[in-house]
């Protein structure tokens, strides 16, 4: 009899066979599920503390998605040969798992919960993020931890008018859509997507299709729980302190209502601090002992009630706008004189300074992904220092939020970038958030597009982004355009839509409550389009098209092609030739395996010289052609003459003139410029030259050295050639 109480569930899910099992591996974890999708295998585990930490006022959920290199049959690089800090993909996938799980933990549950997902086997054609999300949901479901799941997830592609369920990597590469949707049986909770300018209807259809298809996985998790689940925790939220709620409400409600009539964020924030101080003083005067965390939660509920009530009753929003109005926009381009491209995009109290830098092929980011190494020619980095919100804080390496916001903005811009054969530059965008009051990632999209255009990148269209919110109470709802930070915090849905005049390029949706219908999402997407088109009109007015000239400080670039067999000649022994070329011409030279050479420099003269010299190095000597050569060395029986870079031939003593030559030094000297004809090239590459044949063909003459300078015309420097 086995020591394991193993439960296995298998099901067909689109083109993939899925296997979920629990009860064998990681039995001391609160919950552990192994998910196998066509040889992509993840181990998802969850552990929760039995009680919250004293004074805990938030839900401490941690999600760690970890890719093990052995999953792809690799040994890690570096000195220590161990997996190091999380890659960008690991960070983004951790966020992808976190976002749909977090809203499903019950209110008031403040115990530490840690979800850890290990990728232990990888089929390069099957991405691990969907199995990881399904596994994390299943591990929570079997653990008995308070959780209103399970959650299902699906990836949706779109090609030739058809939706694709969980497409392979090869299919994603040719798809017009890469969308991940997660949710419960009843509702969608999270959407993350990149699209090739698709309509709102197609995007909404993909969300609905993904939600329908994920039910297969949700049903399988239910079956797994029935057979292998642990008992549910005996947990209930702490009883509400009604007397405290009444006292805080009595003191705070009128003051909070006053605070939310202040339209400026700084004034409102100051007023809210005063309200908190007044409440604390009133409680102390009344002799009420209250936990600071508990009072803070009551205050938050009151703020939410005020803001949400005002909006649903048709009153102005926090800053005085109606539900559809976008904040005032100001745009300035070419902000930084030495940058290749820059733009300052300001929308209300949110501001992004976005800077574009152009580089060469050698500047591409080399990403050693689990599925295989690849190069990325477009980078977008998002930074939000603490001063952007008027606070102090840590400045340093990017946090998960910054990495996630940067990736969203990048997704929005990728569909409008020119192809590499149209614009060979490596592009880096950096978005510096200098002010923030909501929607900074969408400001990065707008500013990023303008910075690209300012740098002379021929983007296909303007791209704008807008952050939307939603307030839902029973059958009443209101969709908010261009939300503030407080509206994001107090609302039920945060979704960001970016795109062009022609369609959506990126969509990110996070829903905090269940009950948002297809019809509500339809209204929200239509209102988002209205806001996006308004922002696009402002951007088009500020900058109608990309600059036709690159910045004077940006590198110029030319591309040429040589035969792959000639690459080693250009590189030279130990890289000597190419190193000399780059140093002497002041250029950067990149050589691809197919023989494509990219020469970049801020000097057009340097590029032209480098190209000319490479053409000389790779040129083939042709029999019958006359070359301008240089005498390198004199021999008793002739001379060695260089006719092309790296191409030397023998000028035999009998091929100098038609008469008998007793001493070659009477006719030639080292360093002398002569015109010679290539008369023979054997299979070993040895060249035979003739001076007298060239003289006869061109009608020239040569005299002995002691009779004066050679009559042969001097060849131009660099070895030009003539038929």
Curated annotation (Swiss-Prot):
Domain (KH) ranges: 555-614
Gene3D superfamilies in alphabetical order: GHMP Kinase, N-terminal domain, K Homology domain, type 1, Nucleic acid-binding proteins
Official protein name in the record: Polyribonucleotide nucleotidyltransferase
Main enzyme class: transferase
Region of interest (Disordered), ranges: 701-723
Entry binding sites for Mg(2+): 488, 494
Domain S1 motif: residue ranges: 624-692
Subcellular location: Cytoplasm
Gene Ontology MF, one: polyribonucleotide nucleotidyltransferase activity
Superkingdom field: Bacteria
Single GO BP term: mRNA catabolic process
Gene responsible for this protein: pnp
Membership in a protein family: Belongs to the polyribonucleotide nucleotidyltransferase family.
EC numbers: 2.7.7.8
Coiled coil ranges: none
Cofactor(s) the protein needs: Mg(2+)
Any one cellular-component term (Gene Ontology): cytosol
Record's keyword terms, sorted: Cytoplasm, Magnesium, Metal-binding, Nucleotidyltransferase, RNA-binding, Transferase
Catalytically driven reaction(s): RNA(n+1) + phosphate = RNA(n) + a ribonucleoside 5'-diphosphate
PROSITE patterns reported for this sequence: KH_TYPE_1 (PS50084), S1 (PS50126)
Function: Involved in mRNA degradation. Catalyzes the phosphorolysis of single-stranded polyribonucleotides processively in the 3'- to 5'-direction.
Originating organism: Cupriavidus taiwanensis (strain DSM 17343 / BCRC 17206 / CCUG 44338 / CIP 107171 / LMG 19424 / R1)
Biased composition (Low complexity): 707-723
């Amino acid at each position: 009899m086995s020591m394991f109480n193993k439960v296995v569930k298998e099901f067909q899910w689109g083109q993939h066979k899925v296997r979920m099992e629990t009860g064998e591996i990681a039995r001391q974890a609160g919950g552990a599920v192994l998910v196998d999708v066509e040889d992509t295998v993840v181990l998802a585990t969850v552990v929760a503390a039995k009680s919250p930490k004293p004074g805990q006022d938030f839900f401490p959920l941690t999600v760690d998605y970890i890719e093990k290199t052995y999953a792809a049959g690799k040994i890690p690089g570096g000195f220590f040969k161990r997996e190091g800090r999380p890659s960008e993909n690991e960070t983004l996938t951790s966020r992808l798992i976190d976002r749909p799980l977090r809203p499903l933990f019950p209110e008031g549950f403040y115990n530490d919960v840690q979800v850890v997902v290990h990728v232990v086997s990888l089929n390069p054609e099957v991405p691990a993020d969907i199995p990881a999300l399904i596994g994390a949901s299943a591990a929570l479901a079997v653990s008995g931890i308070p959780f209103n799941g399970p959650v299902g997830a699906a990836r949706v592609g779109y090609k030739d008018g058809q939706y694709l369920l969980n497409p392979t990597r090869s299919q994603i590469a040719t798809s017009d859509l890469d969308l991940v949707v997660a949710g419960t049986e009843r509702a969608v909770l999270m959407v993350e997507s990149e699209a090739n300018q698709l309509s709102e209807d197609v995007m909404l259809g993909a969300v609905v299709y993904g939600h329908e298809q994920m039910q297969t996985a949700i049903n399988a998790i239910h079956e797994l729980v029935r057979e292998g689940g642990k008992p549910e925790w005996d947990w209930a939220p702490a009883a509400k302190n009604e007397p405290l709620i009444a006292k805080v409400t009595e003191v705070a409600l009128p003051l909070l209502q006053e605070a939310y009539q202040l339209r400026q964020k700084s004034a409102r924030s100051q007023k809210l601090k005063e309200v908190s101080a007044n409440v604390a003083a009133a409680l102390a005067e009344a002799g009420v002992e209250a936990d600071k965390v508990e009072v803070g939660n009551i205050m938050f509920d009151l703020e939410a009630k005020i803001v949400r009530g005002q909006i649903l009753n048709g009153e102005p929003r926090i800053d005085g706008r109606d539900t559809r109005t976008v904040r005032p926009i100001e745009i300035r381009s070419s902000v930084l004189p030495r940058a290749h491209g820059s733009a300052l995009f300001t929308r209300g109290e949110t501001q992004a300074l976005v800077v574009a830098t152009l580089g060469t092929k050698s500047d591409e980011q080399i990403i050693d992904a689990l599925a295989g190494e690849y190069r990325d020619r477009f980078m977008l980095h998002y930074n939000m220092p603490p001063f952007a919100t008027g606070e102090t804080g840590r400045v340093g390496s990017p946090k998960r939020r910054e990495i996630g916001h940067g990736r969203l903005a990048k997704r929005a811009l990728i569909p409008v970038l020119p192809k590499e054969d149209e614009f060979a530059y490596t592009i880096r965008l950096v978005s510096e958030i200098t002010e923030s009051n909501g929607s900074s990632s969408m400001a990065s999209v707008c500013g990023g597009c303008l910075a690209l255009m300012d740098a002379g990148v021929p983007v296909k269209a303007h791209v704008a982004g807008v952050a939307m919110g939603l307030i839902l109470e029973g059958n009443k709802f209101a969709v908010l355009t261009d939300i503030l930070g407080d509206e994001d915090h107090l609302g039920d849905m945060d979704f960001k839509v970016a795109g062009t005049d022609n369609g959506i390029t990126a969509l990110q949706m996070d829903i905090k409550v269940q009950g948002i219908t297809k019809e509500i999402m339809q209204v929200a997407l239509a209102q988002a389009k209205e806001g996006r088109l308004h922002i696009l009109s402002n951007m088009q007015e500020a900058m109608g098209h990309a600059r036709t000239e690159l910045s004077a400080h940006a590198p110029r670039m030319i591309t040429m092609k040589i035969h792959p067999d000639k690459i080693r000649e250009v590189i030279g022994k130990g890289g000597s030739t190419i190193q000399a070329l780059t140093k002497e011409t002041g250029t950067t030279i990149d050589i691809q395996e197919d023989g494509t050479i990219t020469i970049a420099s801020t000097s057009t003269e340097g590029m032209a010289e480098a190209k000319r010299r490479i053409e000389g190095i790779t040129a083939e000597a042709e029999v019958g052609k006359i070359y301008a050569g240089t005498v390198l060395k004199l021999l008793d029986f002739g001379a060695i003459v260089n006719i092309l870079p790296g191409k030397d031939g023998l000028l035999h003593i009998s091929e100098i003139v038609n008469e008998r030559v007793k001493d070659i030094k009477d006719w030639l000297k080292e360093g002398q410029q002569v015109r010679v004809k290539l008369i023979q090239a054997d299979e070993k590459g040895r060249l035979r030259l003739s001076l007298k044949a060239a003289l006869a063909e061109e009608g020239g003459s040569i005299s002995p050295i002691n009779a004066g300078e050679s009559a042969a015309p001097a060849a131009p420097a660099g070895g030009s050639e003539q038929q």
